[in-house]
Amino acid sequence: QVLEIELSISYDVDPSSLDKDKMPPIMDASVYDIVQKVVMTTKFKAMEGLALEIARRIMSNYTVAELVSVVIRRRQLFIPGDVQSAEVEITVDREDLGEK
């Protein structure tokens, strides 16, 4: 099945430390690698479980991340009626994961 995944990661940044030639600490392909690994190697009955696991892995791999939002959208539905897609959005912070 084809899933669309949107990911938002929030963290504090000192504007004076930003450099146009350097990427912020978590803006690289490793984020994609984490999401791909979770999607390809784990099975969940509900999209909520997948979204939560993606958020957990991002938070555990990037200590700078304070808040992670994951949206998962599935366009291919096998249910009757005029439904275009199913979507779930989960937002977690470190407190939600029992880290503070």
Regions found by a protein language model. Give the residues of each.
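N-terminal, polar/charged subdomain of small-to-medium soluble alpha/beta proteins
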Residues: 1-100
